[in-house]
C-alpha cells in the first residue's frame, strides 16, 4: 500500500511538472522568439565583421 501510494504521488508530481512546463513556454515563446532573433543576429553579424578584418 505504501509503495503504491508513493508511486502514484511520484507520477502525479511528474505529470504536474510536465503540464506546467508545457503551459508556460507557449506565451514566452512569442517574447523569446522576438528577443532571441535580435540577440542571435547581433553576435552573428559581429562575428562576421571580425572575420574579414583578420
From Swiss-Prot:
A lipid is attached at residue 2 (S-palmitoyl cysteine). Pfam families: Rod_cone_degen (PF15201). It is found in: Cell projection, Cilium, Photoreceptor outer segment; Membrane; Endoplasmic reticulum; Golgi apparatus. GO terms for cellular component: cytoplasm; endoplasmic reticulum; extracellular region; Golgi apparatus; photoreceptor outer segment membrane. Palmitoylated at Cys-2. Palmitoylation is essential for protein stability and trafficking to the photoreceptor outer segment, but does not appear to be essential for membrane localization. Probably palmitoylated by ZDHHC3. Phosphorylated. Residues 25-54 are annotated as: Disordered. The keyword Transmembrane helix does not apply. Changing residue 25 to T: In RP36; no effect on protein level. One of its GO terms (molecular function) is opsin binding. The keyword Phosphoprotein applies. It is a lipid-anchor. Belongs to the PRCD family. This is Photoreceptor disk component PRCD. It comes from Homo sapiens. The gene is PRCD.
Amino acid at each position: 500500500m505504501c509503495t503504491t501510494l508513493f508511486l502514484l504521488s511520484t507520477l502525479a508530481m511528474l505529470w504536474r511538472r510536465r503540464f506546467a512546463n508545457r503551459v508556460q513556454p507557449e506565451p514566452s515563446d512569442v517574447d523569446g522568439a522576438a528577443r532571441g532573433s535580435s540577440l542571435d543576429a547581433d553576435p552573428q553579424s559581429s562575428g562576421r565583421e571580425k572575420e574579414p578584418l583578420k
